[in-house]
Amino acid sequence: MSGYILAIDQGTTSTRSMLFDRNMRVVGLGQQEFTQHFPSSGWVEHDAEEIWKSVQSTIRIALAQAGISAADVAAIGITNQRETTVVWDRISGKPVHRAIVWQDRRTAQFCDELKRRNLEPLFTEKTGLLLDPYFSGTKLAWLLNHVPGLRERAQKGQVCFGTIDSWLIYKLTGGKAHVTDATNASRTLIYHIGENRWDDELLDILGIPAAMLPEVKDCAADFGMTDPALFGVSIPILGVAGDQQTAVIGNACFEPGMMKSTYGTGCFALLNTGTDRVTSSNRLLTTIAYRLDGVTTYALEGSIFIAGAAVQWLRDEMGFISVVSEVSALAEKADPNQRIYLVPAFTGLGAPYWDAEARGAIFGLTRGTGRAEFARAALESVAYQTFDLLEAMQGDWKGATNHTVLRVDGGMVASDWTMQRLADILNAPVDRPVFLETTVLGAAWLAASRAGIWPDRKGFSERWQRDCRFEPAMPEKERESAIAGWRDSVSRCLTRPQ
């Protein structure tokens, strides 16, 4: 049987390739970790060539596991870690420097300088983003300023810039395609998300030559054909989007007002705002959720730095649990009369506070506080932080009503206790899907729908399956008291008034 779909999920610490059949079932999986480089404090780099090798390797593993050949693959979809910045020689295809990862903070001073020049409102108006080292633009400017001769080569069109998706497409097509999609472009700090174009004014401010930029396409489009020298046949690449955006798609959040939240080490929540490009007054990001058939759908995005990492802290630093899976059962044993708050500002606080200097703290300790209370506080901190995001989104956009249903994915959502507490604090239903790998599923759908093998948006939404819906059950007075305690705790950790 042909008609298989290959989805490549290139993440921050590992690469996965997953094969789906016509019925959207997983039939093959390859996964491989790669090296993290930390050349200086706050710097994070990846070897783009190592990432490319991991993609080739995991594709071959997935094909072997499925027992099929590349000739049986109808289309490829790609999803990727966003913002990570690669520059390579247009002819040789060799990177000029290691990739600068989204986590890298080396351009913090440059961002501060741009803020002092009062340029952040301009960037936000055009890109929906904040002036932060997180995004690609200042990383690319750093490379142009620090790699000898790079600026001159860029001006002559001799080098290419791209996010990871663009780099992989270039390599997969044997150097024939230098392209990206609208979602990845929207994370660069140089793309006008209202006019869907690279912005000359922002390029000029950052000193970036337009000649090095990729062509921007819809998320489901013809991105090129794989070089037959790689797998013996040419396979069309038909779907591309950043990882948080494919999670929106994989959760079938196609209607305005639908919201997804991915819980891993951190948390990323995106609220579909339809064709409304909402400007946040709460320092949330405005981003492109997806662009299909030339129509741009926008989202409000909020990021939480510490979610599952709080549980890892209980295990690794505190020694309260041996394995992460123990935490829910331990939290259930906590004394209900104790209300302990953990503000996990281990690396500052993200949206909507954006306080990089805030530090973590624990409030409400008594002589009877033990491991169980710490476990409950760690899990509850995820719910409270999600509440902060939802409240900010509801303040920014009238479509984010109190009737919002949150669809969740990621490692933490396997815990029934955590999901129930999330529903209680949000006072909103929480839906957990049957298939939790929504990021890679979204990439597969983009390619498969373009190929005409999987159903369209309506059909895909109808096939989305819910494993469990968690309905809010906490009495309102108890909920209000709990949230008031959280707000008080956070206020004590902030370094500047909100």
Swiss-Prot record:
Signal peptide: none annotated. Inhibited by fructose 1,6-bisphosphate (FBP). Pathway: Polyol metabolism; glycerol degradation via glycerol kinase pathway; sn-glycerol 3-phosphate from glycerol: step 1/1. ATP binds at residues 12-14, 265, 308, 312, 411. GO terms for cellular component: cytosol. It catalyses: glycerol + ATP = sn-glycerol 3-phosphate + ADP + H(+). Keywords: ATP-binding, Glycerol metabolism, Kinase, Nucleotide-binding, Transferase. Coiled coil: none annotated. Glycerol binds at residues 82-83, 134, 243-244. It is an enzyme of class 2 (transferase). InterPro entries: ATPase_NBD, Carb_kinase_FGGY, Carb_kinase_FGGY_CS, FGGY_C, FGGY_N, Glycerol_kin. It comes from the Bacteria. Sn-glycerol 3-phosphate binds at residues 12, 82-83, 134, 243. ADP binds at residues 12, 16, 265, 308, 411. Key enzyme in the regulation of glycerol uptake and metabolism. Catalyzes the phosphorylation of glycerol to yield sn-glycerol 3-phosphate. Belongs to the FGGY kinase family. NCBIfam families: glycerol_kin, PRK00047.1. This is Glycerol kinase. It comes from Brucella suis biovar 1 (strain 1330). The gene is glpK.
